Amino acid sequence: MSSLFALRLFGYRLLKPLGWPVSRAVAIPRPTLFVGPDASLRLCASIGQFGYRRVMIVTDAVLVKLGLVEPLRQALLAQGIDVAVHDGITPDPTYPVLQAGYEAVRAHRSDAILAVGGGSAIDAAKVIGAMAVSGKSPAKLIGMLKVGKPMLPLFAIPTTAGTGSEVTVAAVVTDPVQHVKSAVIDPKLVPLAAALDPLLMKGMPKAITAATGMDALTHAVEAFINRWPHADTEQHCVAA
């Protein structure tokens, strides 16, 4: 174990007792949820109704190749929205991946982001949206309540069941040099709205559907035995 890692671990253990009171004191926004077949298209319609005119779709190349992104792009175009697609997101997004997404959003002058994909795509979109407004690097955003200004408006369409990132305050980023994953945690990261569309999940490979289903179960068990539950945690865990 390196001395730097040991020091970080010691610091986290010192701060851990503060987590519960902080988590109870900070209000967590609840996104509007569109649920059911074609919920993703209803979400796209709502983006136009919110008045956003330049939307960046943040996703990965696999989903573009599978044809899952194009109907969403067309739904936005039909509302007269200027749409760009950034498909450079990779699993466990690293600082360079996030920087590339940030530069794409800046070049397009996006006024909103639509995240399409699994946890990595949604987490990346959260951090990119925060970077676009704050100008901070991913490393400067790591930790609790460091986003500062409200980020670019974010909408999320998960294509797997395993993440939950579409309703959470956190995003996980990877330092490619230290090979360390860290979390950006801030209520400002919660999307304005999210779509839970079973038709999109049906289009995913069977192995991905099975693996992310187990991931969802793991999250439910984790939250159920968590020592810092919120009022509705148990209800959602049992339902899952």
What does each model-identified segment do?
Residues 1-85:
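An N-terminal, well-structured beta->alpha segment
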Residues 38, 42, 50, 67, ...:
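Conserved active-site and cofactor/substrate-binding residues in soluble primary-metabolism enzymes
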Residues 85-95:
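Short beta->alpha junction loops
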Residues 170-240:
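Carboxylate- and glycine-rich phosphate/diphosphate-binding segment that chelates Mg2+/Mn2+
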Residues 96-196:
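Glycine/threonine-rich beta-strand-loop-alpha-helix active-site module
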Residues 47, 51, 76, 80, ...:
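Structural signal for hydrophobic packing residues in well-ordered secondary-structure cores
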Residues 44, 73, 84, 99-102, ...:
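Predominant activation on well-ordered alpha-helical scaffold segments within soluble catalytic domains
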